[in-house]
Amino acid sequence: MERRTTMTSMMKGFVLIAFASLFLVPVYGQAAEPEKHDAKASKLDTTAIEKAIGKAGELKDEVYKISMPRTDLKVMVKDVTLKPGLALGSWVAFKQAGNEAVVDGDLVLTEDEVAPVFDKLRKEGIEVTALHNHLIGETPRVMFLHVAGKGDAARLASHIKAALALTKTPLGELARKPGEVSTKTGAEEAGFNAEQIQQVLGHKGRVKGGVLQVSVPRPEPIKMEGITLPPSMGMATALNFQQAGEGKIAATGDFVMIRDEVNAVTKALAEHGIMVTALHNHLVHGSPELYFMHFWANDTAEKVAKGLRAGLDAMKVKPATN
């Protein structure tokens, strides 16, 4: 009888331990173990992602990124009509991490789209890591919703598509893969001297849809819950330029900074007539802790480029080109 009682107590103990262990499994949104490289890890299923989202993407450095510009919107800042590639580009980026995929992204939404998309993402298990403005004084008002998730790639993509379906974001049939090189030179397609801007910045970019896009990666690895996020997953300073009338350009984007760089960059931009329009986070559980500073400039190409170069210098970013 005593032996039976002892066995019963042991079994109850095992059940309690097993039950408690269910709450110790790390999920996206809680502390996780450091990233591991499993030789048997599955490969990112880009075909399944394409089919789920309804649009093709671009694979680079093990990241599959799908761009979804809001070409349906006509947004103006004062008298400047924004090209989609300047400040209206929704995107999601997928990366394989062990036997699961991780996703993060930035969804461009009108004010009336925010509530239904936010609610749908929550119900589908996709995390919202930030909701904020990037611009000031734009019409109509545009908001930016940052998302993150971890799990099966196709399932993550289908959940995001379910939220996008509540917006007017153009998707349609599977699109041709982006990144095709225009037959025009950068200056011809952009309508301004894109090469001059790149020389001043000390970093090369690309012209797409009439917009010069320059990406400047941070020097240190960026992680979220132990998973490394490459620059293409929104972890690089983004500087975008478009023509804005005779002899002028408009520029916007965001500086990706650690806390000790924030005040120095703010000062550098202000001294060159560049307006800071937002300062906030994009991630939760990020390491190091990052701050994203958005800006707006409308002046000659040379003046704007010099101002943004001063911002990069304040971050002690080394030029990539001469």
Regions found by a protein language model. Give the residues of each.
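Boundary at the C-terminal end of the N-terminal hydrophobic targeting segment
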Residues: 27-31
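Bacterial N-terminal signal peptides that target proteins for export
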Residues: 2-17
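Bacterial N-terminal signal peptides
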Residues: 14-26
